[in-house]
Amino acid sequence: MLYYFIIGIPFLLVILRLVLTNILVPHFKKKQQKNQLSQRSDWSNIENKTRILEALYKKDHAKYSSVRYRLLHLIQDKEFVYGEIDFLSFYTLLERTCPSTQDVFYDLGSGSGKGVFSALLFFNVKKSIGIELLPPLYKQSNTRLEKATQRFQQHDVEQEYLPQMERIQFINDSFLHYDFGDADIIYVAATCLSDPTWNELISKMAGLKPGSRIIVTTRMIHHEQFETVYQGIELMSWGLCPVRIYKIKH
Protein backbone atom coordinates (compact mmCIF):
# COMPACT_ATOMS: atom_id res chain seq x y z
CA MET A 1 0.00 0.00 0.00
CA LEU A 2 2.85 2.34 0.91
CA TYR A 3 4.49 1.54 -2.43
CA TYR A 4 1.44 2.71 -4.41
CA PHE A 5 1.19 5.82 -2.26
CA ILE A 6 4.83 6.71 -2.92
CA ILE A 7 4.67 6.20 -6.69
CA GLY A 8 1.44 8.22 -6.76
CA ILE A 9 3.02 11.29 -5.15
CA PRO A 10 4.50 12.71 -8.42
CA PHE A 11 1.11 12.36 -10.09
CA LEU A 12 -0.61 14.14 -7.20
CA LEU A 13 1.96 16.94 -7.33
CA VAL A 14 1.28 17.42 -11.04
CA ILE A 15 -2.47 17.60 -10.37
CA LEU A 16 -1.92 20.07 -7.54
CA ARG A 17 0.24 22.26 -9.75
CA LEU A 18 -2.38 22.24 -12.51
CA VAL A 19 -5.11 23.22 -10.03
CA LEU A 20 -2.97 26.05 -8.64
CA THR A 21 -1.81 27.48 -11.98
CA ASN A 22 -5.01 27.03 -13.98
CA ILE A 23 -7.75 27.55 -11.38
CA LEU A 24 -6.79 29.00 -8.00
CA VAL A 25 -4.14 31.57 -8.98
CA PRO A 26 -6.18 32.94 -11.94
CA HIS A 27 -9.27 33.07 -9.69
CA PHE A 28 -7.52 35.19 -7.07
CA LYS A 29 -5.85 37.33 -9.74
CA LYS A 30 -9.25 38.09 -11.28
CA LYS A 31 -10.75 38.81 -7.86
CA GLN A 32 -7.89 41.16 -6.98
CA GLN A 33 -8.18 42.95 -10.30
CA LYS A 34 -11.93 43.43 -9.90
CA ASN A 35 -11.47 44.75 -6.36
CA GLN A 36 -8.91 47.31 -7.56
CA LEU A 37 -11.07 48.50 -10.45
CA SER A 38 -14.18 48.69 -8.27
CA GLN A 39 -12.52 51.47 -6.24
CA ARG A 40 -12.48 53.75 -9.27
CA SER A 41 -15.07 56.41 -9.99
CA ASP A 42 -15.66 55.01 -13.50
CA TRP A 43 -16.16 51.42 -12.32
CA SER A 44 -19.90 51.34 -13.11
CA ASN A 45 -19.12 52.23 -16.73
CA ILE A 46 -16.39 49.57 -16.98
CA GLU A 47 -18.63 46.98 -15.34
CA ASN A 48 -21.55 47.76 -17.65
CA LYS A 49 -19.45 47.38 -20.78
CA THR A 50 -17.93 44.17 -19.44
CA ARG A 51 -21.44 42.78 -18.97
CA ILE A 52 -22.32 43.68 -22.55
CA LEU A 53 -19.20 41.91 -23.83
CA GLU A 54 -19.91 38.83 -21.71
CA ALA A 55 -23.48 38.74 -23.02
CA LEU A 56 -22.27 38.94 -26.62
CA TYR A 57 -19.98 35.96 -26.03
CA LYS A 58 -22.24 33.95 -23.74
CA LYS A 59 -22.55 31.05 -26.18
CA ASP A 60 -19.17 31.25 -27.83
CA HIS A 61 -17.79 28.11 -29.49
CA ALA A 62 -14.66 29.64 -30.97
CA LYS A 63 -12.24 27.19 -29.38
CA TYR A 64 -14.29 24.21 -30.59
CA SER A 65 -14.52 25.72 -34.09
CA SER A 66 -10.77 26.27 -34.17
CA VAL A 67 -9.98 22.70 -33.07
CA ARG A 68 -12.54 21.20 -35.48
CA TYR A 69 -11.22 23.18 -38.46
CA ARG A 70 -7.62 22.23 -37.70
CA LEU A 71 -8.53 18.55 -37.37
CA LEU A 72 -10.53 18.53 -40.62
CA HIS A 73 -7.71 20.23 -42.51
CA LEU A 74 -4.90 18.30 -40.78
CA ILE A 75 -3.34 21.49 -39.44
CA GLN A 76 -0.84 20.55 -36.73
CA ASP A 77 1.00 23.86 -36.50
CA LYS A 78 0.86 25.05 -32.89
CA GLU A 79 0.59 28.65 -34.14
CA PHE A 80 -3.15 28.03 -34.45
CA VAL A 81 -3.66 26.88 -30.83
CA TYR A 82 -6.61 28.93 -29.62
CA GLY A 83 -6.54 31.29 -26.65
CA GLU A 84 -8.55 34.35 -25.67
CA ILE A 85 -8.35 37.53 -23.65
CA ASP A 86 -10.00 38.14 -20.29
CA PHE A 87 -12.14 41.28 -20.65
CA LEU A 88 -11.07 43.08 -17.47
CA SER A 89 -7.40 42.17 -17.89
CA PHE A 90 -7.54 43.41 -21.45
CA TYR A 91 -9.12 46.65 -20.29
CA THR A 92 -6.22 47.33 -17.93
CA LEU A 93 -3.70 46.44 -20.64
CA LEU A 94 -5.30 48.73 -23.20
CA GLU A 95 -5.49 51.51 -20.64
CA ARG A 96 -1.71 51.33 -20.25
CA THR A 97 -1.36 52.27 -23.93
CA CYS A 98 -3.30 55.52 -23.32
CA PRO A 99 -5.76 54.97 -26.19
CA SER A 100 -7.57 57.92 -27.73
CA THR A 101 -10.61 58.30 -29.96
CA GLN A 102 -8.21 58.97 -32.85
CA ASP A 103 -6.35 55.66 -32.50
CA VAL A 104 -6.68 52.73 -34.87
CA PHE A 105 -6.54 49.36 -33.08
CA TYR A 106 -5.54 46.03 -34.64
CA ASP A 107 -5.78 42.53 -33.19
CA LEU A 108 -3.41 40.27 -35.11
CA GLY A 109 -4.95 36.80 -34.96
CA SER A 110 -8.25 38.10 -33.62
CA GLY A 111 -10.07 34.78 -33.14
CA SER A 112 -13.76 35.42 -32.53
CA GLY A 113 -13.19 39.15 -32.07
CA LYS A 114 -13.14 39.71 -28.30
CA GLY A 115 -10.19 42.09 -28.41
CA VAL A 116 -11.71 44.08 -31.27
CA PHE A 117 -15.02 44.62 -29.47
CA SER A 118 -13.23 45.41 -26.21
CA ALA A 119 -11.06 48.13 -27.72
CA LEU A 120 -14.06 49.86 -29.26
CA LEU A 121 -16.51 49.57 -26.37
CA PHE A 122 -14.04 50.38 -23.62
CA PHE A 123 -12.13 53.19 -25.34
CA ASN A 124 -14.17 54.26 -28.37
CA VAL A 125 -11.19 54.08 -30.72
CA LYS A 126 -11.45 55.47 -34.24
CA LYS A 127 -11.35 52.00 -35.83
CA SER A 128 -11.04 48.51 -34.40
CA ILE A 129 -9.84 45.84 -36.81
CA GLY A 130 -9.27 42.12 -36.42
CA ILE A 131 -7.15 40.03 -38.78
CA GLU A 132 -7.92 36.31 -38.59
CA LEU A 133 -6.70 33.59 -40.95
CA LEU A 134 -9.01 30.70 -39.99
CA PRO A 135 -12.34 31.00 -41.89
CA PRO A 136 -14.65 29.69 -39.11
CA LEU A 137 -13.26 32.20 -36.59
CA TYR A 138 -13.54 35.02 -39.11
CA LYS A 139 -17.15 33.97 -39.74
CA GLN A 140 -17.92 33.87 -36.01
CA SER A 141 -16.48 37.37 -35.62
CA ASN A 142 -18.90 38.76 -38.17
CA THR A 143 -21.74 36.81 -36.56
CA ARG A 144 -20.88 38.53 -33.26
CA LEU A 145 -20.90 41.88 -35.04
CA GLU A 146 -24.40 41.20 -36.37
CA LYS A 147 -25.52 40.07 -32.91
CA ALA A 148 -24.10 43.23 -31.31
CA THR A 149 -25.79 45.45 -33.89
CA GLN A 150 -29.15 43.77 -33.30
CA ARG A 151 -28.74 44.04 -29.53
CA PHE A 152 -27.98 47.76 -29.63
CA GLN A 153 -30.91 48.38 -31.99
CA GLN A 154 -33.30 46.67 -29.57
CA HIS A 155 -32.03 48.11 -26.27
CA ASP A 156 -32.75 51.82 -25.91
CA VAL A 157 -30.19 52.29 -23.12
CA GLU A 158 -27.47 50.78 -25.34
CA GLN A 159 -28.26 52.55 -28.62
CA GLU A 160 -25.34 54.91 -28.05
CA TYR A 161 -23.06 52.00 -29.00
CA LEU A 162 -24.80 51.33 -32.32
CA PRO A 163 -22.79 53.85 -34.43
CA GLN A 164 -19.57 52.35 -33.06
CA MET A 165 -20.31 49.02 -34.74
CA GLU A 166 -19.67 50.65 -38.12
CA ARG A 167 -16.06 51.16 -37.03
CA ILE A 168 -15.42 47.45 -36.51
CA GLN A 169 -13.92 45.41 -39.32
CA PHE A 170 -12.82 41.79 -39.59
CA ILE A 171 -10.39 40.63 -42.26
CA ASN A 172 -9.86 37.02 -43.35
CA ASP A 173 -6.14 37.08 -44.10
CA SER A 174 -2.67 36.49 -42.68
CA PHE A 175 -1.31 39.38 -40.63
CA LEU A 176 2.01 38.83 -42.41
CA HIS A 177 0.35 39.68 -45.73
CA TYR A 178 -2.14 42.37 -44.74
CA ASP A 179 -1.06 46.01 -44.55
CA PHE A 180 -1.73 47.30 -41.02
CA GLY A 181 0.48 50.35 -41.44
CA ASP A 182 -2.23 52.70 -40.12
CA ALA A 183 -2.17 51.02 -36.69
CA ASP A 184 -1.70 53.07 -33.53
CA ILE A 185 -2.23 50.16 -31.14
CA ILE A 186 -1.64 46.48 -31.88
CA TYR A 187 -2.38 43.39 -29.82
CA VAL A 188 -0.70 40.13 -30.77
CA ALA A 189 -0.98 36.88 -28.82
CA ALA A 190 2.52 35.69 -29.68
CA THR A 191 2.63 32.79 -27.20
CA CYS A 192 2.48 30.03 -29.82
CA LEU A 193 4.01 31.81 -32.81
CA SER A 194 7.02 30.12 -34.42
CA ASP A 195 10.37 31.90 -34.48
CA PRO A 196 10.24 32.57 -38.26
CA THR A 197 6.71 34.02 -38.03
CA TRP A 198 7.60 36.12 -34.99
CA ASN A 199 10.77 37.51 -36.54
CA GLU A 200 8.96 38.39 -39.76
CA LEU A 201 6.19 40.09 -37.79
CA ILE A 202 8.72 42.11 -35.75
CA SER A 203 10.34 43.34 -38.97
CA LYS A 204 6.94 44.36 -40.28
CA MET A 205 5.90 46.14 -37.06
CA ALA A 206 9.22 48.00 -36.95
CA GLY A 207 7.93 50.04 -39.90
CA LEU A 208 4.97 51.41 -37.94
CA LYS A 209 4.76 55.14 -37.29
CA PRO A 210 6.61 56.50 -34.24
CA GLY A 211 4.56 56.31 -31.06
CA SER A 212 2.63 53.20 -32.08
CA ARG A 213 2.09 50.77 -29.20
CA ILE A 214 2.28 46.98 -29.37
CA ILE A 215 0.88 44.63 -26.71
CA VAL A 216 2.57 41.22 -26.82
CA THR A 217 1.92 38.01 -24.85
CA THR A 218 4.82 35.79 -23.73
CA ARG A 219 7.46 36.72 -26.29
CA MET A 220 9.99 39.54 -26.18
CA ILE A 221 11.09 41.97 -28.88
CA HIS A 222 14.80 42.63 -29.25
CA HIS A 223 14.94 45.38 -31.85
CA GLU A 224 16.37 48.89 -31.73
CA GLN A 225 13.10 50.39 -32.98
CA PHE A 226 11.08 49.14 -29.98
CA GLU A 227 11.04 50.60 -26.48
CA THR A 228 9.62 48.58 -23.56
CA VAL A 229 7.07 50.66 -21.63
CA TYR A 230 5.46 47.94 -19.50
CA GLN A 231 5.92 44.33 -18.50
CA GLY A 232 3.88 42.23 -16.11
CA ILE A 233 1.84 39.07 -15.57
CA GLU A 234 -1.74 39.25 -16.82
CA LEU A 235 -4.73 36.92 -16.89
CA MET A 236 -5.69 35.23 -20.16
CA SER A 237 -8.07 32.37 -20.94
CA TRP A 238 -5.22 29.86 -20.54
CA GLY A 239 -4.05 31.28 -17.20
CA LEU A 240 -1.47 33.84 -16.12
CA CYS A 241 0.79 35.03 -18.91
CA PRO A 242 3.78 37.40 -19.27
CA VAL A 243 2.72 40.50 -21.22
CA ARG A 244 4.82 43.39 -22.50
CA ILE A 245 3.92 46.69 -24.11
CA TYR A 246 6.32 48.24 -26.59
CA LYS A 247 6.42 51.64 -28.24
CA ILE A 248 7.90 52.52 -31.61
CA LYS A 249 10.71 55.01 -31.05
CA HIS A 250 10.79 58.44 -32.67
Mark where each language-model region is:
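S-adenosyl-L-methionine
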Residues: 3-101, 140-180
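Conserved class I S-adenosyl-L-methionine
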Residues: 102-111
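Conserved SAM-binding loop of SAM-dependent methyltransferases across substrates and taxa
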Residues: 114-125
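Conserved short alpha-helix immediately C-terminal to the canonical SAM/SAH-binding motif I
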Residues: 115, 136-137
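Conserved SAM-binding motif I beta-strand of class I
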Residues: 127-132
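A short SAM/SAH-binding and catalytic strip from SAM-dependent methyltransferases
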Residues: 184-196
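C-terminal substrate-binding/active-site "lid" region of AdoMet-derived donor-dependent transferases
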Residues: 193-250
